[in-house]
Curated annotation (Swiss-Prot):
Cysteines paired by S-S bonds: C12-C121, C51-C173, C117-C150
Family: Belongs to the calycin superfamily. Lipocalin family.
CDD domains on file: lipocalin_crustacyanin (cd19436)
Compartments it resides in: Secreted, Extracellular space
Gene Ontology terms: cellular component: cytoplasm; extracellular region
Subunit structure: Oligomer; Can form dimers (beta-crustacyanin); or complexes of 16 subunits (alpha-crustacyanin). There are five types of subunits: A1, A2, A3, C1 and C2.
General function of this protein: Binds the carotenoid astaxanthin (AXT) which provides the blue coloration to the carapace of the lobster.
Main localization category: secreted
Origin species: Homarus gammarus
Record PANTHER family: APOLIPOPROTEIN D (PTHR10612:SF34)
Protein name: Crustacyanin-C1 subunit
Pfam families listed in its UniProt record: Lipocalin (PF00061)
Amino acid sequence: DKIPDFVVPGKCASVDRNKLWAEQTPNRNSYAGVWYQFALTNNPYQLIEKCVRNEYSFDGKQFVIKSTGIAYDGNLLKRNGKLYPNPFGEPHLSIDYENSFAAPLVILETDYSNYACLYSCIDYNFGYHSDFSFIFSRSANLADQYVKKCEAAFKNINVDTTRFVKTVQGSSCPYDTQKTL
């Protein structure tokens, strides 16, 4: 058996989850709305390659997510998920998409109206972990000043920002069609 390439030696980054949780909980509903995926690190669970558009609807307790875009095979794809407070009381969110498993998610930094920097990590036995990072934008493009804010947030927890790959967005994307999926 071979260890998947996204499972690497080391531990998850040290994040002050309690501080972030306390700051973000009162503003959680502000996270609702449309977010475009601007960039991400290698993630075998992200089945949508291009034009990634996420709609977050808040019901007072959790977000229902509709993610759409173009899959690796070139076809439109819709995935349904949920984002909710960790059910065991830990100070982070859990993200759970259909045909996957729930994973911890921390919003490292956001202003709720332009950008969000997201980090997910799971520690395994024997000193291994998997971490996945995302940069989201409220529009198909993201101003450099906000990209720099996310880069600084990730560097602050020692995530190598050269791991990020920009997501194709823009005029070649069928956003109007995606909205109807």
